[in-house]
C-alpha cells in the first residue's frame, strides 16, 4: 500500500506514542499510513518505528481489510530488525477469518516461523477456531491432530473448539459428548462454553431431553448458563412444540438477571406463532420493546407471518408500519404475506393497495419470491373482478408491463368481467393479447366469449381473429 508522505513538522524528540496518537487521530487508514511513513522521512531526526507503532498500523490496515499492505508491513518490520510478535501475526489471521478467508489465516499461521515466532497454544487455538467457524471441519481435525503430534497438551479452550466442530453434524455430536466426558481425565474441567456448545448441538438435532439433562448438570456444578445457553434451549424447545416450557425458561433467566436478547425473543415468538398464538407473541413483542431490546428483520417477519396466517391482518399492517418507522425495509416476501392475508379475507382492494405500495416503493421480488409474487398478483386481479373491474384491468396492465405471466383462471375472470359489462370487443382484444404472449385460454373463456355475443357479425370477426392466432 503506497501512501503519499505528509509533511509534518516533527519535534526533535519524537516518540512512538506521539506517532500513534497522530495516526489514531486520522480516521482514514491511508492518511494514517501517511503519518506513519512521514515519521521516518529524512527530516524526522532519525526516528525509527518500534513494535507498538508497527503493531498499531498493522491493526488499522487489517481493520480496513487491506491485508496485503498489512503483510508487507510485517516484512518491513523484519527488515528493520523489529520483533514481529505473535499477537501482530494473529491479528492478521483473525482479520482473514472475519472476511471468511480461512486458508489465508492458515497461510499466515504457517509463516510465523519465518518471523522467528514459534506458534503457541494460543496461536493454534485461534486458527483452529477460525477453521471451525468457516466449516472447514476436516482441515480443523487435521490441524488439531497436528497440535497433539507436536506435543501441545489439550486445554479447555482447544477441546471446546473441537467439541464445537463435532456438534456441527448430527453424526458427530456423540463424539463431542465423549470428549466432554473425558475432559476431567485430561485435567480440563468443562466450562460454561463447553456446556453451551453441547446444549446448542443437541437442540439443533432435536435431542431436547439430553440437552435439558446437561443444562441441569451445568447448574448443579455452579457453571453459570449464559444468554446463549438459555436461547439455544428455548429455541430447541420451541422447535419441538414445547412452547410453554420454553416460556418458563424465559422467566427463569430473567429472574437470574440474565437479559434475553433478540434471538431469545424471536425464537419464542416463532414457537407461539406456529402454535396459533400470534396475539400472545405480540404481547411478548411489546415486552421486548419495553425492555429496550430492538426487534430485527427476523422478529418482524415471524410475527407478520403468524398474524396473517391467523387472519389478523390489521395487526400485521400496524406491525409493518412500525417496522418502517424503525428503518427496516420490508421485502417482497413480507409484502406478499400481507397481500395474501387480505385476499384470504376477501379484501382485494386493500390487497391491491399494498401491491401498489410495494411497486411504487421499488421493492422487487427476487428469485426465491418471484413465483409467490406471480401467484399473489393473479389472485388479487381475480378478486377485484367482482366489484372493482376497472382496478382489476389496471392491475392486469401493470402485471404485463412488469413481465408477470397471467394465469388461465385470471384471464377467464377478466373476460367474464368485461363480457358482463358489455365490453365484448375489449374482451376479444384481451384474449388476443394473451394468446400472443403464449397463454392458451381455457374452454370456459371461449364459452364466455360466445355466450355473451350480441352481434353475430362481431363474433364471427372476433372468432376468425382468435382462430388465426391459434393457427387452427
Curated annotation (Swiss-Prot):
Under the heading Gene3D superfamilies, the entry gives: Tetratricopeptide repeat domain
- Coiled-coil positions are none
What domain of life? Eukaryota
| Annotated disulfide bonds | none
Keywords from UniProt, A to Z, are: Repeat
Can you say where the PPR repeats lie in this chain?
50-84, 85-119, 120-154, 155-190, 191-225, 226-260, 261-295, 296-330, 331-365, 373-406, 407-441
Q: Name one Pfam family in it.
A: PPR_2
Q: Which NCBIfam families match?
A: PPR
Regarding protein family, the annotation reads: Belongs to the PPR family. P subfamily.
| Protein name (Swiss-Prot/TrEMBL) | Pentatricopeptide repeat-containing protein At5g46100
Q: Provide the species name.
A: Arabidopsis thaliana
Amino acid at each position: 500500500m503506497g501512501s503519499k508522505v505528509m509533511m509534518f513538522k516533527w519535534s526533535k524528540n519524537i516518540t512512538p506514542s506521539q506517532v500513534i496518537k497522530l495516526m489514531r487521530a486520522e480516521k482514514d487508514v491511508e492518511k494514517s499510513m501517511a503519518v506513519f511513513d512521514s515519521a521516518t522521512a529524512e527530516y524526522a531526526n532519525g526516528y525509527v518505528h518500534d513494535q507498538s507503532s508497527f503493531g498499531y498500523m498493522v491493526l488499522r490496515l487489517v481493520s480496513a481489510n487491506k491485508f496485503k499492505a498489512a503483510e508487507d508491513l510485517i516484512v518491513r518490520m523484519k527488515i528493520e530488525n523489529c520483533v514481529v510478535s505473535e499477537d501482530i501475526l494473529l491479528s492478521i489471521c483473525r482479520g482473514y477469518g472475519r472476511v471468511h478467508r480461512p486458508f489465508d489465516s492458515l497461510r499466515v499461521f504457517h509463516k510465523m516461523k519465518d518471523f522467528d515466532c514459534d506458534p503457541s497454544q494460543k496461536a493454534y487455538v485461534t486458527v483452529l477456531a477460525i477453521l471451525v467457524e468457516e466449516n472447514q471441519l476436516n482441515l480443523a481435525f487435521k490441524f488439531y491432530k497436528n497440535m497433539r503430534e507436536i506435543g501441545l497438551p489439550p486445554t479447555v479452550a482447544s477441546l471446546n473448539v473441537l467439541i464445537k466442530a463435532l456438534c456441527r453434524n448430527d453424526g458427530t455430536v456423540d463424539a463431542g459428548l465423549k470428549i466432554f466426558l473425558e475432559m476431567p481425565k485430561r485435567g480440563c474441567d468443562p466450562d460454561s462454553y463447553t456446556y453451551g456448545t453441547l446444549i446448542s448441538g443437541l437442540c439443533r438435532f432435536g435431542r431436547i431431553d439430553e440437552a435439558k439433562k446437561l443444562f441441569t448438570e451445568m447448574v448443579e456444578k455452579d457453571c453459570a448458563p449464559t444468554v446463549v445457553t438459555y436461547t439455544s434451549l428455548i429455541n430447541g424447545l420451541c422447535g419441538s412444540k414445547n412452547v410453554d416450557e420454553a416460556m418458563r425458561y424465559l422467566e427463569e433467566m430473567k429472574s437470574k438477571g440474565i437479559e434475553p436478547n433478540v434471538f431469545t425473543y424471536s425464537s419464542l415468538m416463532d414457537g407461539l406463532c406456529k402454535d396459533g398464538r400470534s396475539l400472545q407473541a405480540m404481547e411478548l413483542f411489546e415486552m421486548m420493546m419495553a425492555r429496550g431490546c430492538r426487534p430485527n428483520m427476523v422478529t418482524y417477519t415471524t410475527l407478520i407471518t403468524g398474524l396473517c396466517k391467523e387472519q389478523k391482518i390489521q395487526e400485521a399492517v400496524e406491525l409493518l408500519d412500525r417496522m418502517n418507522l424503525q428503518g427496516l425495509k420490508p421485502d417482497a416476501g413480507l409484502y406478499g404475506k400481507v397481500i395474501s392475508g387480505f385476499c384470504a379475507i376477501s379484501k382485494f382492494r386493500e390487497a391491491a393497495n399494498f401491491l401498489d405500495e410495494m411497486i411504487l416503493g421499488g421493492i422487487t421480488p427476487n428469485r426465491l419470491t418471484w413465483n409467490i409474487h406471480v401467484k399473489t398478483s393473479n389472485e388479487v386481479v381475480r378478486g377485484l373482478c367482482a366489484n372493482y373491474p376497472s382496478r382489476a384491468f389496471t392491475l392486469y396492465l401493470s402485471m404485463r408491463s412488469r413481465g408477470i405471466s397471467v394465469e388461465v383462471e385470471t384471464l377467464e375472470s377478466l373476460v367474464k368481467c368485461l363480457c358482463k359489462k358489455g365490453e365484448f370487443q375489449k374482451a376479444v382484444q384481451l384474449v388476443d393479447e394473451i394468446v400472443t404472449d403464449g397463454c392458451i385460454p381455457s374452454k370456459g373463456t371461449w364459452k364466455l366469449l360466445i355466450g355473451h355475443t350480441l352481434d353475430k357479425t362481431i363474433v364471427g370477426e372476433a372468432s376468425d381473429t382468435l382462430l388465426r392466432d391459434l393457427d387452427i
